[in-house]
Amino acid sequence: MDALFETYAKLRKRMALYRVRAVPNQNYRRDGTKSYVSALNRFGFQPTKPGPYFQIFEKSEEAPSMPVAPGVKPGHVWRGLFKKITGQEEPGEVTAEDQQNDSEYLCEVMIGTAWTAERQIVKMHFDTGSGDFWVRDKSFDPKKSVTWKLAEDKSWKVQYGDGSSASGIMGHDILIIGGIQIKRQAIEIATEMSAQFTEGSMDGILGLAFSKRNTVRTDGEADPQRTVVDNMMAQDDIPPEAELFTAALYSNIEEDLRSFYTFGWIDEDIVKASGEEIVWADVDNSEGLWMFSSEQVTIDDQQVRIEGNKAIADTGTPLVLVSDQVCEALYAHIPGAEYSEEYQGWTIPRETEVDKLPQFRIAIGDKEFIIQKGDLIFAPTDKGVFYGSVQSRGENSFDVLGTAFLKSIYAIWDQGRKRFGAVTKIEAFIPPTKYDRPRLTDEDRKELGVIIGYGDISSTFFEKRA
């Protein structure tokens, strides 16, 4: 590894590469059920546990050869995501209010001529589960970029099960990310957006999955464009060992400012601090996702084998989604934990001491990695319980290892060699008491200028001020 790190050091010096800070989004508010509904909308899988939300599918000979979402079975058309309404026989529509519409972290990139007045800085959500790089039309003005070139015959559209969508035009421009200048990057500008896409703080999404998941069409025909990493790899100044990107995401509120991504190099300090060698797992990208073998979990001393099981590493999902078998085994080790049909998820008693939670390990290839105990708790609810970070994947065919898991490792997406790497990330533990602050009174709200309460949660952390 020393020779490899020396190569990265030289590359960083020659190209002035730097860490891309993943800055905590101050408007992001954790909500367990909303995050789960967002996952249903994102992946399109049918829940296997009871709750208000469900999918409707229909068998059809006209179903696309590649399903519109990973959870949609071949030969089926996804009619949408719906919710049960008390007192009604007909299901209701899922709206922006039912789901999480913002990103936990925001990352700055530049579009346009580097280091000139024409460049435009946008705050993006880095998403390893999608393949489009799109920005809101109000966040990027192509008329101000002398290097922008519109592709008049191309369009794009991202659409989800609740009927929400974002769509618009496409062109090419220069992108600067982590010090790397990428020429002729396909940039999609959202000129039409549903409420789900307009309510968040991000300027857009930078997809880091494979190009198979890109939605661009030329004259109406599918024409997937190269992703950011595809274009980075195609450049002569990027050697084969640099055809990758990495992420170090931190869970503690005090640690958040340290979260970052790198493009083209692996951070030597973090790897050496772990005292471990990087563990690699081969990636199956046939669905355009970062999918690898994950056939085992361990809860304390209980080992659960799932032959042939696969998982994806997904920065676009905050939760960890696993089989019902694994969920039941995990929560059986937490006294008082139970499944809530109301919240459509597993819950943990509020009085649970974090250090009494079980050790939960998930395999990446041949090695298991532990989820830090504090990250097993996702968010409080209004019923005196916590919503767990580990939830059911329903009928989805693979696990989803979201940021609740990724915060425990230094993650490496090696696109050139089609493999995913990880080492344990050392992090001092701080109990998540800041997610459980005292509830505000009406007088408190007036004094603090609180104008919006998120769900039924009332605390200084989960409410927005004027």
Model-predicted regions and their roles:
Residues 180-181, 185, 302-304, 367, ...:
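Well-ordered beta-strand scaffold positions
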